[in-house]
A protein has these predicted regions:
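Residue-level marker of beta-strand positions
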Residues: 33, 83-84, 97, 141, ...
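NAD(P)H dinucleotide-binding glycine-rich loop of Rossmann-like/cofactor-binding domains
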Residues: 72, 84-146
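Short amphipathic alpha-helix with an adjacent loop that forms part of the alpha/beta core around
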Residues: 192-202
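C-terminal hydrophobic helical "lid"/dimerization subdomain
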Residues: 262-310
């Protein structure tokens, strides 16, 4: 799937492109599933710059290695034809087959399905960045905004695993997911701060925003004494206005946390493969319906991770 310009997801078209043979240090992967992320839509709108066309979105996939270039070695060792793998921070993932740098490729655990594997690493490394940057530790009370979403549900699990008490904002339909991971659901909307104070009268130690809405950060500032323990991966403009809030990820003025996120990849895959982390899966779409998948993700109505299945 590709677009000839920066006119948004609606401009995506299915085309036949031969990925070719991998050059040294690269591998070819037959894609089994591709993660769909808001950043893909931003790329298609030129929000990361208007560089080379065609534009081929998709930064995370799972699949099977079909060819390897000379010296193709991933972070955990050599890569062989037939290996089941996960590739993250690639380009052109909305494909049936692609060539990727071996440095982006890690083994897929046998206990992890294709869709979950494709949806783990962007959300998981983002969640790891959130809990690490805010120093979540045993005994903390942590508020996670958007707790039933792809990033939020993983942040809940990681914080609970560190021994924190977790409160998670969600809609009515997301409450079961929040409870399943050991957190206490809080309905978002007007009066959020007051509802949190019913559960935590003295406020909370940490707030992690994956929702990107102003009320989440406003409530966080009211509930957390130390603003250096409030972090957002989505609400950058409002965070900048409020001041003192950690901005993490790919937004303007945000800390990308590249080294931390790269180091977290093997551990996240291992824990997910052993059933210690669960990727909450949302709807799946055929590759040719990538524009519809992106529309759902951008709407904020998707609960869990949306994936494409070539």
């Amino acid at each position: 799937m590709q677009a000839e310009g920066f006119d948004g997801p609606e401009a995506l078209r299915a085309v036949e492109v031969d990925p070719g043979e991998p050059t040294p240090g690269r591998v070819r992967i037959a894609v089994r599933a591709a993660g769909v992320n808001p950043a893909d839509a931003k790329l298609l709108r030129g929000m990361f710059g208007r560089g080379r066309v065609p534009v081929r979105p998709g930064s995370e996939v799972s699949g099977v290695v079909t060819a390897v270039g000379e010296g193709a070695e991933g972070p955990l060792g050599p890569i062989l034809v037939g290996d089941e793998v996960v590739a993250f921070r690639v380009s052109g993932g909305y494909s049936a087959e692609l060539v990727a740098p071996a440095s982006a490729v890690l083994p897929k655990p046998a206990g992890l399905g294709w869709a979950a594997a494709a949806g783990l690493l962007l959300a998981g490394t983002t969640a790891e960045h959130l809990v690490e940057a805010t120093r979540v530790s045993s005994g903390d009370t942590v508020l996670v905004h958007g707790a039933s979403g792809a990033v939020g549900s993983l942040a809940v699990q990681l914080a609970v695993a560190r021994g924190a008490r977790v409160l998670g904002t969600t809609s009515e339909r997301g409450e079961e997911v929040v409870r399943r991971f050991g957190a206490e659901p809080v309905r978002y909307g007007a009066g959020l701060e007051e509802r949190v104070r019913v559960l935590a009268p003295g406020g909370v130690d940490v707030a992690l925003d994956t929702a990107g809405i102003d009320e989440a950060l406003d409530a966080s500032v009211a509930l957390v004494a130390d603003r250096s323990r409030i972090a957002t991966v989505a609400g950058f403009e409002h965070a900048a206005r409020l001041g003192g809030i950690l901005m993490l990820g790919g937004g303007p003025g945000a800390d990308p946390g590249t080294a931390l996120r790269d180091a977290a990849r093997p551990g996240l895959l291992d824990r997910a493969g052993r059933g210690e982390l669960e990727v909450v899966l949302g709807p799946s779409f055929p590759l040719t319906e990538a524009a519809a998948a992106l529309a759902l993700v951008e709407s904020g109505r998707a609960r869990g991770k949306t994936v494409l299945l070539p």
